[in-house]
């Protein structure tokens, strides 16, 4: 009896690869592990993908397309920044794959839809052509990507995660506003407002509720650690 093709198989394989990446990075992503996690056989995976890097390339391409689709629904540059952060934090494993060396991160010499979308929005707001704003967009992207990776990889803990997300959006909008008011003039850069440094942004649209749960867990763990330290200090006394 002929076997019926599974139209969802390739997506299951990519989802499995993403989960495995989240557990242990590239070293945990073997063809056999992908097959087991996807609920299929290793030969079946090889029928669709040559090797691990081929799977990662496919996952990377899909993630780029999904990020672009998410950004196209935004009405303003500020919303684009917010959505970029939200996407990176909601799809953290896929986002890490997108910029990992194994999968070769995008460069200015290959199509990068999301980067080009930002440049087009900058051209609409500031004038000129998208290419004119490549340098500015590199600075803005560095801000967004750096913030996302610091949060994803746990370099920022507790309430600092939320403050960093707000500060990133504030900084993004401040830089764009400074470029808008000074276009055609030479300037030394935007002057940073006090609320940016203090992390008092009011961007209520930013969906960072999923970070608050981890913040509470971190506070609980810090409290336990503090209690242990205090008990040890008391005992030594």
Predicted regions: what they are:
Residues 6, 56, 60, 64, ...:
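Amphipathic, non-transmembrane alpha-helical scaffold segments
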Residues 103-139, 162-174:
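Amphipathic alpha-helical packing segments from all-alpha helical-bundle domains
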Residues 12, 16-54:
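Helix-turn-helix
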Residues 30, 96-99, 107, 153, ...:
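Short, hydrophobic secondary-structure boundary micro-motifs
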């Amino acid at each position: 009896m002929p076997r019926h093709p599974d139209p969802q198989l390739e997506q299951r394989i990519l989802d499995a690869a993403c989960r495995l990446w989240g557990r242990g990075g590239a070293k945990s992503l073997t063809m056999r592990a992908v097959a087991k996690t996807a609920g299929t056989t290793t030969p079946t995976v090889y029928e669709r993908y040559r090797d691990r890097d081929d799977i990662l390339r496919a996952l990377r391409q899909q993630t780029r397309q999904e990020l672009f689709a998410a950004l196209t629904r935004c009405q303003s540059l500020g919303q684009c920044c917010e959505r970029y952060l939200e996407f990176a934090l909601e799809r953290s494993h896929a986002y890490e794959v997108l910029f990992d060396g194994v999968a070769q991160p995008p460069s200015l010499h290959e199509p990068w839809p999301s980067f080009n979308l930002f440049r087009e929005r900058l051209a609409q707001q500031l004038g000129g052509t998208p290419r004119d704003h490549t340098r500015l967009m590199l600075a803005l992207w560095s801000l967004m990507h750096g913030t996302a990776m610091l949060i994803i990889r746990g370099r920022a803990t507790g309430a600092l995660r939320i403050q960093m997300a707000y500060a990133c959006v504030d900084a993004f909008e401040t830089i764009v506003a400074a470029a808008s008011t000074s276009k055609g003039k030479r300037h030394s850069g935007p002057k940073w407002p006090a609320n940016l440094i203090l992390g008092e942004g009011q961007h209520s649209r930013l969906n960072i509720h999923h970070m608050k749960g981890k913040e509470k867990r971190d506070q609980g763990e810090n409290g336990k650690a503090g209690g242990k330290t205090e008990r040890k200090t008391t005992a030594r006394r």
